[in-house]
UniProtKB/Swiss-Prot annotation:
Recorded GO CC terms: bacterial nucleoid
Similarity field: Belongs to the RecO family.
Species the sequence originates in: Cupriavidus metallidurans (strain ATCC 43123 / DSM 2839 / NBRC 102507 / CH34) (Ralstonia metallidurans)
GO process annotations (BP): DNA recombination; double-strand break repair
Keyword DNA damage (UniProt): yes
InterPro entries reported for this sequence: ARFGAP/RecO (IPR037278), DNA_rep/recomb_RecO_N (IPR022572), NA-bd_OB-fold (IPR012340), RecO (IPR003717), RecO_C (IPR042242)
Purpose: Involved in DNA repair and RecF pathway recombination.
Name of protein: DNA repair protein RecO
Length: 298
């Protein structure tokens, strides 16, 4: 599993005290680091604060305009502002302060909503940027009911697996497509399996599902396989741990093609993705996932 943490750098106090406080708030509610040796929440908070307060002297202030993005999470900040965690097309996950966004007559209130496609502009050179403009782009149907809960599950996955400021344009496009599919009423279990697979592959946690990694041979539909964490697909062995789900080659081929028309593919892909997500998160629970499991959508 790749280490998504960045190398440590000398710390310096942030030039913006608001950004500094926002980083502290964001860190206190940050998602646990997957490989933290100490308490996950403590480790995440420390790392977020370290990076938020870091200033790189040789780097000019970053200004980004009209970047496509979505709000993944928002923390209330002070009386009138928000700290946002957004997912953008060309910059990946970005933390930023939306000053005055909670004011009654702020134009940002209606724009900074979950699952709204928006054009974002920001400035800053630390971990926490300052939002300067946000415009609703439109073009997508709103989520409601079960689809809305599934959307929050997608957001939680992105928060867990995507490091900050690491662009994943393919994953961004797939996120948009997944929201569209959910808004049109496609079965959540099918749509979410597809997103989970792309997420693990795009973030480097998983490889191809239709090819044996060691031999390079294409998966055969009539044979049984396991997905060995850190290595990939291979034929089953008698010595395989009982916790590793056995899946048919047909299931793996179907997953690679986003085909969930077979009942066996639906059940086996569910077991496989539960196993992989549990492994790569080191057992850390996903809040929305448990709700969906209880509702039998996962």
């Amino acid at each position: 599993m790749p280490d998504v943490r960045r190398a440590a750098a000398p710390r310096a106090r942030s030039a913006d005290p608001i950004a500094e406080e926002a980083a502290e708030l964001l860190g206190s509610g940050a998602v646990p680091a997957m490989n933290a040796a100490v308490s996950p929440s403590v480790a995440a908070g420390r790392e977020m604060m370290d990076r938020a307060m870091r200033i790189v002297p040789a780097r000019s202030e970053l200004r980004v305009t009209n970047e496509a993005g979505f709000v993944l999470h928002a923390h209330p900040y002070r009386e009138t502002s928000l700290v946002l965690d957004v997912f953008t097309r060309d910059h990946g996950r970005v933390a930023m302060v939306a000053k005055g966004a909670k004011r009654p007559h702020s134009a940002l209130r209606a724009v900074l909503q979950h699952f709204h496609p928006i054009a974002l502009s920001w400035t800053g050179r630390g971990e926490v940027k300052t939002l300067t403009k946000a415009e609703y782009v439109g073009g997508m149907l709103p989520l409601s009911g079960d689809a809305l809960l599934s959307g929050f599950y997608l957001n939680e996955l992105l928060l867990r697996f995507c490091p900050r400021e690491d662009a994943h344009p393919t994953l961004f496009r797939h996120y948009m497509a997944t929201l569209t599919r959910l808004s049109h009423g496609e079965p959540a279990s099918f749509v979410l399996r597809s997103f989970e697979r792309v997420l693990l592959q795009e973030t480097g946690f998983a490889v191809a599902f239709d090819q044996c990694l060691r031999s390079g041979e294409r998966v055969q539909p009539g044979l049984d396989y396991v997905y060995q964490p850190e290595r990939g697909v291979r034929r089953t062995h008698a010595s395989d741990p009982s916790s590793w789900p056995v899946v048919s080659g047909q299931t793996l081929l179907d997953m690679a093609q986003d085909d969930y028309s077979r009942a066996q593919t639906v059940s086996q892909s569910r077991a496989l993705m539960r196993f992989l997500l549990h492994y790569y998160l080191q057992g850390a629970p996903l809040k929305t996932r448990q709700i969906l499991i209880d509702l039998q959508y996962l």
